[in-house]
Amino acid sequence: MARSFKKIPFVSNKLLKKVKLFNRKKVILTWSRASTIVPVMIGNVIAVYNGNKHIPIFVTDGMIGHKFGEFSATRTFKSHKS
């Protein structure tokens, strides 16, 4: 068994408290892009800061186990000139 299976997922304590307190009533602001999405967060809208503004993310069951940073891009892509 790999070491990563033994490690528990990182979730900000402040974020977990907000999720339990608001319970799908408000958009939750967070700066913690490294936090892992856990089943308690399903159905909530969490706005993740990308360095410029907060990007709202509606958490679904397919997102469990991923990090919030995966869903808020920090760089804008300008297409290559043809």
Swiss-Prot record:
Acyltransferase recorded as keyword: no
Localization in the cell: Plastid, Chloroplast
GO biological process: ribosomal small subunit assembly; translation
Any one cellular-component term (Gene Ontology): small ribosomal subunit
Highest rank taxon of the organism: Eukaryota
Keyword Disulfide bond belongs to the record: no
Ranges in a coiled coil: none
First-listed, main subcellular location of the protein, grouped into a coarse class: plastid
Key words, A-Z: Chloroplast, Plastid, Ribonucleoprotein, Ribosomal protein, RNA-binding, rRNA-binding
Gene Ontology MF terms: rRNA binding; structural constituent of ribosome
The family this protein is said to belong to: Belongs to the universal ribosomal protein uS19 family.
Its biological purpose: Protein S19 forms a complex with S13 that binds strongly to the 16S ribosomal RNA.
PANTHER family: RIBOSOMAL PROTEIN S19P FAMILY MEMBER, SMALL RIBOSOMAL SUBUNIT PROTEIN US19M
Name listed for the protein in its UniProt record: Small ribosomal subunit protein uS19c
Organism of origin: Bigelowiella natans (Pedinomonas minutissima)
Name of the gene this protein is made from: rps19
